[in-house]
Amino acid sequence: MSKSGDNQPVDRYLRRQILGEGTYGVVYKATDTKTGKTVAVKKIRLGNQKEGVNFTALREIKLLKELNHPHIVELIDAFPHDGSLHLVFEYMQTDLEAVIRDRNIFLSPGDIKSYMLMTLKGLAYCHKKWVLHRDMKPNNLLIGENGLLKLADFGLARLFGSPNRRFTHQVFATWYRAPELLFGSRQYGAGVDVWAAGCIFAELLLRRPFLPGSTEIDQLGKIFQAFGTPVPSQWSDMIYLPDYMEFSYTPAPPLRTIFPMASDDALDLLAKMFIYDPRQRITIQQALDHRYFSSSPSPTEPGKLQIPASKGDALEPKASEQNQHGNSPAVLSPPGKMRRVMGPEGFT
């Protein structure tokens, strides 16, 4: 830290405009006066430790300092100032949610393949480093002017690997939460990120949220409606999970009826990402090796991908119209879009 009277780290960043606000702080666009580059500064209010903010922010800083990959957002700087913690990131122009919702953008099969390839490469690196992201969703996948997609928001990320380590199951936005989490599992691994990535894949294909449940019970119902109710022969351990409950049996419809325009290879990969038993679910590295990524068409080069002129343009209405999931209201972002912040007590 600089001595009193010297220039403070915050003076290096010239604030330009607010990009977003949440419960625990604000993100604003700024100019790094030292380099001339545009950056994004996340300003987090430092509440008391019972609120969990300090721990969450410090975990994010620690993990991001150890993660260095083309498809993971770069943490440039971090410093306390005036009762807040400032995290300085490379500036990214938009996110995948904005791309999916922008009806002025046509997503070709090659475009979808490119976005999934970049997403899985970033996740594969995390898992290689024994890091679970635990908050995968389209608006946490940021996109720069060069079309490169990068994983962001590691506030819920945790190290994994110990077979006896217990975590909270209250992670991920509900729409992207794996069934083992919805059944209350406290011991889980990389399969939870795989399931969420599958939901993102489906969302790219459909151009709308795939499983937009309103509650955890409704979320399970939507999953079972799409993939059939699991039976013990598919997932023997589910009946032992803390919050397991029995649902009436629903047979699985053919995936082709849900994704009529998807290729056979895309459907095969989706099916493997949505396997109920997390021990049998495809890994991220296996997904990257899947024939979907080597078959025609080739992934679009990132620099040729279309991105919105600015986030918020040409978006669909959020609530007034009906979506394609029966009579449910059209909602385009998960309830509680700001990430959940866990306190220091209990599971992590």
Swiss-Prot record:
One of its GO terms (molecular function) is protein serine kinase activity. Its EC number is 2.7.11.22, 2.7.11.23. One of its GO terms (biological process) is positive regulation of long-day photoperiodism, flowering. PROSITE patterns: PROTEIN_KINASE_ATP (PS00107), PROTEIN_KINASE_DOM (PS50011), PROTEIN_KINASE_ST (PS00108). Disulfide bonds: none annotated. Activated by phosphorylation by CDKF-1. Down-regulated by phosphorylation by WEE1. Expressed in suspension cell culture, but not in plant organs. Phosphorylated by CDKF-1 at Ser-162 and Thr-168. Phosphorylated by WEE1 at Tyr-24. Autophosphorylated. The modification Phosphoserine is found at residue 162. The active site is at 135 (proton acceptor). The modification Phosphotyrosine is found at residue 24. It holds the Pfam family Pkinase. It is an enzyme of class 2 (transferase). Forms a stable complex with cyclin CYCH1-1 that phosphorylates human CDK2 and the C-terminal domain (CTD) of the large subunit of RNA polymerase II. Interacts with CYCH1-1. Binding to CYCH1-1 activates CDK kinase. This is Cyclin-dependent kinase D-2. It comes from Arabidopsis thaliana.
